Amino acid sequence: MKHTFRSLLLAATLASPLFAADAPNYAIQPVLHPGTEKRHESFNVISKQGAAELVFLGDSITHAWEGRGKAVWDKTWAPLKAANFGISGDRTEHVLWRLDHGNFDGLKPKAIVLMIGTNNTGHQGRPQKEIDNAVYKCTAEQTAVGIKAILASLQKKCPDAKILVLGIFPRGADKNDKFRQQNEATNAIIKGYADGKKVFFLDVSDKFLEADGTLPKSIMPDLLHPNEKGYQIWSDAMEAKVKELLK
């Protein structure tokens, strides 16, 4: 019965008019992210130890709490018994694979912070022929369904945890960036997943942006990944909500 929900979700997705029969939604098809096995297994060890009360789950932006965001992490999040389950380059389908292969098994966190999906929107720096390939190019709706599947898996594994779904961060120089627009469209959908009881939604995008929608390189030098200043902004924007969920 492990994949029953996933199978039903996939069938419903493929039957939807949003998706043609020849365009499967890769965002909900669990697949190993090659080269990440060692880090994945380290998460399984943490899960079995069962000590973490707060888990951050996501892609490179989450992963980099151990890099550009480390000073902020050590000051604010480490004292809360937090664990970092971020893997650079991960998409929703990679997180689903991880959840199917031991992540969170035996772990009973009080809260989970989830942000995933910008790599489903598009990988920075990939050749155009790959970006145009359906495996790499998801619609906002497809990405949102992938996030919904992750939520279902997390709730099954950690029924008592409160999950904070973060809006996908803004990217690109300004509001005309197509990847940013798609992230915003995804956020508009996943906002509806919050029930105010076990699942919550928080979008901190405006904290990174200028009044005209410009994304400053002083916060995200590559217009995608925050620097240390950006991690402080992120931390400050969600700290109160996360601590509320940990009570």
Where are these regions (language model features)?
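N-terminal secretory targeting modules
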Residues: 1-57, 61-75, 243-247
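Catalytic His-Asp segment of secreted/periplasmic serine-dependent ester chemistry enzymes
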Residues: 169-247
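Solvent-exposed, acidic/flexible segments
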Residues: 54, 85-88, 92, 136, ...
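Generic structural signal for well-ordered alpha-helices
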Residues: 147-152, 187
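Structural recognition of the beta-strand scaffold that forms the well-ordered cores
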Residues: 53-58, 81-86, 110-116, 120, ...
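Oxyanion-hole/transition-state-stabilizing segment in secreted/luminal serine hydrolases
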Residues: 63-78, 92-144, 153, 164, ...
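A structural signal for short coil/turn segments at secondary-structure junctions
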Residues: 49-50, 77, 158, 194-197
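Short amphipathic alpha-helices and their capping/turn segments at secondary-structure boundaries
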Residues: 41-55, 96-106, 151-155
